[in-house]
């Protein structure tokens, strides 16, 4: 079977690795154009491109797949199937119709819940009990196609966006390989999604990461976990930015953002409802530290009565 793979970030690269170890032929890889990254803003290839180059697989990086030339280039590859994972470009119907068996997608949620760009973080933020990967046939709509296969994992009370991402990146690739086998032998039939159950996972926005201490503590605790390792929740103290990487639910009352107490166990801050104990912070110019380490060296900065977010 001739497969064209389309994907961009590390999550997608894990799927490409599994396909490279499978009996299927990867005839080409599509990925986003190289982007500036790092302090020097040097053009860097995507994780998928780097892997493809290392395996001498032809790489295509069109700005769009909506024009006839790009579509003809894809058709010339004569793909039996296109596997799409976090590619970042919309595929028009003309592209979906090119492969003999169509296009399939590995999506990091239990569809139809959390269609869209940030399903992993939105599941943690919402307090969902479980997440997973759905392999589906692609349609022109956003994550709307018939579902071929699902794998499920519980979301634990200490899962972050990062830990859930890594777990799903391990679960998704074998599911895709299994789905391809089912398509090849005709044993796998798609299940139509119930649009009434659909929710949308909006793209992450850095502005969302600014902590609004008037919100309930339970919501903020989930947000802090969801946005770790990116974009990372933050607030201000004494005019300086403070990144908050971990927190636990606590008790106490005060003005939103008010420091209620500080100890080696954590920095207790009042929220709109109850309080949070901040257990891992990062100050400007420093690395992320447990609050017990910060408390030993910067105790005066975290005096009770000070207010975060002002």
UniProtKB/Swiss-Prot annotation:
It is an enzyme of class 2 (transferase). Its EC number is 2.1.2.9. GO terms for cellular component: cytosol. CDD domains: FMT_core_Met-tRNA-FMT_N, Met_tRNA_FMT_C. PROSITE patterns: GART. Pfam families: Formyl_trans_C (PF02911), Formyl_trans_N (PF00551). It catalyses: L-methionyl-tRNA(fMet) + (6R)-10-formyltetrahydrofolate = N-formyl-L-methionyl-tRNA(fMet) + (6S)-5,6,7,8-tetrahydrofolate + H(+). InterPro entries: Fmt, Formyl_trans_C, Formyl_trans_C_sf, Formyl_transf_N, Formyl_transf_N_sf, Formyl_transferase-like_C_sf, GART_AS, Met-tRNA-FMT_C. One of its GO terms (molecular function) is methionyl-tRNA formyltransferase activity. Keywords: Protein biosynthesis, Transferase. (6S)-5,6,7,8-tetrahydrofolate binds at residues 109-112. It comes from the Bacteria. The keyword Mitochondrion does not apply. The keyword Transferase applies. Attaches a formyl group to the free amino group of methionyl-tRNA(fMet). The formyl group appears to play a dual role in the initiator identity of N-formylmethionyl-tRNA by promoting its recognition by IF2 and preventing the misappropriation of this tRNA by the elongation apparatus. PANTHER family: METHIONYL-TRNA FORMYLTRANSFERASE (PTHR11138), METHIONYL-TRNA FORMYLTRANSFERASE, MITOCHONDRIAL (PTHR11138:SF5). Belongs to the Fmt family. This is Methionyl-tRNA formyltransferase. It comes from Pseudomonas putida (strain GB-1). The gene is fmt.
């Amino acid at each position: 079977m001739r497969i064209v793979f389309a994907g961009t970030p590390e999550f997608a690269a894990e799927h490409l690795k599994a396909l490279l170890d499978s009996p299927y032929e990867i005839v080409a890889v599509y990925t986003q154009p190289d982007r500036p990254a790092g302090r020097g803003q040097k053009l860097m290839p995507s994780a998928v491109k780097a892997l493809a180059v290392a395996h001498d697989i032809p790489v295509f990086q069109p700005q769009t797949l909506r024009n006839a030339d790009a579509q003809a280039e894809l058709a010339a590859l004569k793909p039996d199937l296109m596997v799409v994972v976090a590619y970042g470009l919309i595929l028009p119907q003309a592209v979906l119709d090119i492969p003999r068996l169509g296009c399939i997608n590995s999506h990091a949620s239990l569809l139809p819940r959390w269609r869209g760009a940030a399903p992993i973080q939105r599941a943690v933020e919402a307090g969902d009990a479980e997440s997973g990967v759905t392999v589906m046939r692609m349609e022109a709509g956003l994550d709307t196609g018939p579902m071929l296969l699902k794998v499920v994992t519980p979301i634990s009370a200490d899962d972050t966006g990062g830990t859930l991402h890594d777990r799903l990146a391990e679960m998704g690739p074998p599911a895709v390989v299994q789905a391809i086998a089912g398509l090849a032998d005709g044993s796998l039939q798609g299940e139509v999604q119930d649009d009434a159950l659909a929710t949308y996972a909006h793209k992450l926005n850095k502005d969302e990461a600014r902590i609004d201490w008037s919100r309930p503590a339970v919501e903020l605790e989930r947000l802090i976990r969801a946005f770790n390792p990116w974009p990372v929740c933050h607030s201000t103290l004494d005019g300086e930015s403070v990144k908050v990487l971990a927190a636990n639910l606590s008790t106490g009352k005060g003005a939103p953002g008010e420091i209620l107490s500080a100890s080696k166990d954590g920095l207790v801050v009042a929220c709109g409802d109850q309080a949070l104990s901040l257990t891992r912070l990062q100050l400007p110019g420093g690395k992320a530290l447990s609050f017990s380490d910060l408390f030993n060296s910067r105790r005066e900065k975290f005096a009770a009565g000070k207010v975060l977010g002002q």
